[in-house]
Swiss-Prot record:
Protein name per UniProt: Membrane protein insertase YidC
GO CC, one annotated term: plasma membrane
Membrane topology designation: Multi-pass membrane protein
Main location group: membrane
Keyword Transmembrane among UniProt keywords: yes
Record HAMAP family: YidC_type1
Superkingdom classification of source: Bacteria
Subunit structure: Interacts with the Sec translocase complex via SecD. Specifically interacts with transmembrane segments of nascent integral membrane proteins during membrane integration.
Gene Ontology biological process terms, A to Z: protein insertion into membrane; protein transport
PANTHER family in the cross-refs: CYTOCHROME C OXIDASE ASSEMBLY PROTEIN COX18, MITOCHONDRIAL (PTHR12428:SF65), OXA1 (PTHR12428)
Keyword Glycoprotein in record: no
Transmembrane feature ranges: 15-35, 321-341, 343-363, 409-429, 506-526
Length: 544
């Protein structure tokens, strides 16, 4: 077996592992978003479901009486929250500090509230009516309605409490009181329907962001994925997660059921009632970045407004197999960013540091390849001499390697040992929340979490799924070709078709594979290629 075939197999193995890694990363990290809205009109009638208007008015002190559906907009330090007096639900929740591609606050709620809502309480029947509204203060808001069930009158309150600090958390309280000291209506439990569609995206953003949705649940100290028909008792929390944002819900002693309706997977939170005269249940909702800086503060009671502890929201951020390698890498990136506040430069500097640290492996692999190159004349003689006797050829090749003190796989192991570092860097740059919206070169690379763009088509090209003309993929391809040529000592005249494909076809294939990848990842790749070219020149000079 000659040297070129060994190199070919090594490269194929590396590419296979890289492709497998990227495939597994896509499959297990996400489920593609799918949602259909409706324009169905909803008619409102203040007296529709309540017969005794005198009781209705006497109980409304401090609440606003509104005879038509109205949106209530609340602004906090971190949210623009919009509530509807129809059913008293939250219909929009925008993050003030995290903008979308249109430079508007990102809206985490993606539902058509005329027909279904983000977080809907389902009692014996759904109270489809207008609610009274009361603003206690800027952080506390209540919605109240009254309904009859089997001739008995009940007060129904939904209370929303925002955090005093800049925490992406709110408390949602469900209160149902019997006004005539009745036992609660004849049910053992009630449900909260959690619509799993989050992060409302514009058409442009849908074309740009590779945005996926996962239904997640944390149970028995393990992160699991929701699926149709799944039922779990007493999970720590449930939620919906996209690449950069998530909504997580926690409450003690709840049961969760997952059910697919109209193609959308929904979560049903089942809450036991028993023989009580009232309901007063609290739910804590995290709605914000998928970032441990904001998630982990709810593990210690002294670190958050509501005094929560051991919620484990931070476990929603999956740890890759290379997590132990990623942690120091991110720390190094942060150090560079603190000195020069530009995440693009931080990626470049981190890549250079990593390449310097693994230089001994690179040098060892190149030297092993050079030693094999010196044996090429003798290897060709043996191949000609024993071309009809493969067994004898292998024996003589083995004897030659032993006599010359050369390991034929010496150039392969250093390459394979570098793969975990590549995987760790890939995961870090591809998923780091800090890169979302981070500009490298204004006007060209405005967001390191998506591809660069010099021209947007406004639609997706059918065959290649391109939405923009991008420059970085071309730079990546040409630097990859340069790195391949410099590293391989190519004799173009003597290359076979298979080798030509390996050396020239692979960079072109990666051009199409990585075309829509985040620009931060391509900056890492380009920096690696350029550093490799300079590194190989140095090694050749040293060995000569």
């Amino acid at each position: 077996m000659n040297q070129s075939k060994k190199i070919l197999r090594t490269v194929y193995l590396s590419l296979f592992l890289i492709g497998l890694f990227m495939l597994i990363n896509d499959i297990f990290s996400s489920i593609m978003l799918s949602f259909k809205s409706s324009d169905k009109e909803v008619q409102f009638d203040l007296n529709k479901s309540f017969d005794d208007n005198e009781i209705f008015l006497s109980k409304s002190n401090g609440f606003d009486l509104i005879n038509k559906s109205q949106n209530i907009v609340v602004e906090t330090e971190i949210y623009f929250a919009t509530f509807s007096t129809f059913r008293g639900n939250l219909v929009s929740l925008k993050l003030k500090n995290h903008l979308n591609l249109e430079k508007d606050p990102t809206d985490l709620i993606n539902v058509d509230y005329k027909n279904e809502t983000f977080f809907d309480v389902s009692l014996d029947y759904l109270v489809e009516d207008l609610f009274l509204y009361k603003k206690i203060d800027n952080l506390n808001h209540e919605f109240k309605a009254y309904f009859k069930n089997h001739g008995k009158i009940y007060e129904y309150v939904k209370k929303y409490t925002f955090s005093e600090k800049n925490e992406y958390l709110m408390k949602f309280t469900v209160i149902v009181n019997s006004l005539n000291d009745y036992d609660l209506f004849d049910i053992d439990s009630y449900k909260i329907v959690f619509s799993s569609e989050i992060e409302r995206l514009s058409d442009k953003a849908k074309l740009q962001y590779n945005n996926y949705l996962s239904q997640i649940i944390y149970y028995d100290n393990k992160l699991k994925y929701g699926k149709d028909g799944l039922s779990i008792n007493n999970p720590r929390w449930i939620g919906s997660s996209t690449k950069y944002f998530e909504v997580l819900i926690s409450r003690e002693n709840m049961e969760v059921e997952f059910k697919k309706e109209r193609g959308v997977l929904k979560s049903f939170i089942v809450n036991n009632v028993g023989n009580k005269k009232n309901i007063s249940d609290e739910f804590f909702i995290y709605a914000g970045p998928k970032d441990n800086r904001y998630l982990d503060i709810f593990d210690k009671s002294g670190d958050n407004t509501f005094g929560l502890s051991d919620i484990a929201f931070g476990m929603s951020v999956e740890k890759s197999l290379w997590y132990l390698i990623q942690v120091p890498m991110q720390m190094v990136m942060q150090v560079f960013y603190d000195v020069i506040p530009n995440w693009g430069l931080s990626i470049i500097f981190l890549t250079i540091v990593v390449r310097i640290l693994i230089f001994p492996l690179t040098f060892k692999g190149f030297r092993a390849t050079a030693e094999l190159s010196k044996l090429q004349p003798k290897m060709k003689e043996l191949q000609v001499k024993f071309k009809h006797d493969p067994k004898k050829l292998n024996e003589e090749m083995g004897r030659l390697y032993k006599e010359e003190g050369v390991n034929p796989l010496g150039g392969c192991f250093p390459v394979i040992l570098q793969l975990p570092i590549f995987f760790a860097l890939y995961s870090l740059v591809n998923n780091l929340f800090l890169l979302r919206g981070a500009s490298f070169i204004p006007g060209w690379i405005d967001d390191l979490s998506i591809g660069d763009s010099v021209y947007n088509f406004g639609y997706r090209l059918y065959f290649v799924s391109w939405t923009d003309i991008r420059i970085l993929p071309f730079i990546m391809m040409f630097t990859q070709l340069g790195s391949t040529i410099v590293s391989s000592n190519l004799d173009l005249k003597n290359l076979g078709a298979q080798q030509k494909f390996l050396y020239f076809g692979m960079p072109i294939m990666f051009f199409f594979i990585l075309y829509n990848m985040p620009s931060g990842l391509l900056i890492y790749w380009i920096t690696t290629n350029i550093f490799t070219i300079l590194q190989q020149y140095y090694i050749k000079m040293h060995l000569s």
